[in-house]
């Protein structure tokens, strides 16, 4: 699609300035909400940039979102004749207002009680002995746990009652006769 140079410059300038660009998926929209160019031209230019890997595209809820890549930054710097000191807004550190350090502030800000963990009482109260046993090797979960006795033989068949009840028990619901009933 042929895009006038003036509109192409406006789109590129905005994209480089912000580092990101969005557009509603409406090809008939007369003008983009942020830039004074038709929405279709924004979408088509960004599709071209995407194919050259200058931007990364995300589409969600009928909106396109384009994020400038490092290659795109270099391309736009050359295209717009900008010095390397100028960077998109997404790469600038935001200046946060200095926060209060923890525990400082006006003394009447919050009532302060006695210090919480002095030496006169244990830190965790009555939980001192909890998991306080000797530690074993990693993967060893401690305690005197042994294996099953040697004579233990697990059985997964019912001990009488209702043979064939449950999964794989044989018989019932379309299964053929069990092997014990075949004679």
Swiss-Prot record:
GO molecular-function terms, A-Z: RNA binding; structural constituent of ribosome
Compartmental location: Cytoplasm
Biased amino acid composition, Basic and acidic residues: 109-130
Composition-biased stretches (Gly residues): 131-146, 161-175
Coiled-coil regions listed in the entry: none
PANTHER family the record matches: 40S RIBOSOMAL PROTEIN S10, RIBOSOMAL PROTEIN S10
Record-stated family: Belongs to the eukaryotic ribosomal protein eS10 family.
UniProt name for this protein: Small ribosomal subunit protein eS10z
Lineage: Eukaryota, Viridiplantae, Streptophyta, Embryophyta, Tracheophyta
Recorded name of the encoding gene: RPS10-1
